[in-house]
Design a protein with these regions (language model features):
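Conserved active-site tyrosine of GNAT-family acetyltransferases
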Residues: 18-23, 81, 112
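Conserved beta-strand-loop-alpha-helix junction that forms the acyl-donor binding cleft
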Residues: 11-15, 36-37, 100
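Mid-chain, well-packed structural core segment of small domains
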Residues: 66-85
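N-terminal beta-strand motif that seeds the catalytic metal site of vicinal oxygen chelate
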Residues: 1-19, 67
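Conserved short beta-strand elements that form part of the metal-binding/catalytic scaffold
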Residues: 30-65, 110, 114-120
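Conserved acetyl-CoA-binding loop of GNAT-fold acetyltransferases
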Residues: 24-30, 85-87
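Vicinal oxygen chelate
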Residues: 82-120
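Short aromatic/hydrophobic contact patches that present stacked aromatics
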Residues: 7-9, 43, 66-68, 105-107
Length: 120
């Protein structure tokens, strides 16, 4: 058995909140756009990663995921995010911190999900 990718679906009450985090803050690009449709949806892509965003208030209230994005240069990511979108820094992990398991991490959050940025 062989897999190539794991592609998460993320549900938002308002899809523009997800676009602010993933496109404006983290630099993902919109690869497929149905944002202005009756059931807003888009596919975001960056560096071989893919995420599906959906606007669905019912499912958004049922799902609050947390993801980890692994990088080889956490300082670069932190500098960009902390300057451009400090409102996304998670209050419990707002600075790069060496964790007991050996990873360096900081975290982001919007109203729907948490994202831990991690470097091993």
């Amino acid at each position: 058995m062989n897999f190539e990718k794991l592609v998460p679906n993320i549900f938002y009450v308002d899809i523009t909140n997800g676009l602010k985090l993933f496109v404006d803050c983290l630099g993902f690009a919109i690869g497929h756009d149905e944002i202005r449709s009756h059931q807003p949806f888009c596919v975001l892509e960056k560096d071989g990663l893919r995420i599906n965003l959906f606007e669905n208030a019912k499912l958004a209230k049922e799902h609050n995921p947390e993801f980890r994005l692994v990088t080889k240069n956490i300082e670069e990511v932190y500098d960009k995010v902390s300057r451009s979108h400090p409102e996304f820094l998670h209050p419990n992990l707002p600075k790069i911190t060496l964790r007991p398991w050996g990873a360096r991490e900081f975290a982001l959050m919007d109203g729907q999900l948490g994202v831990v940025i991690q470097e091993w």
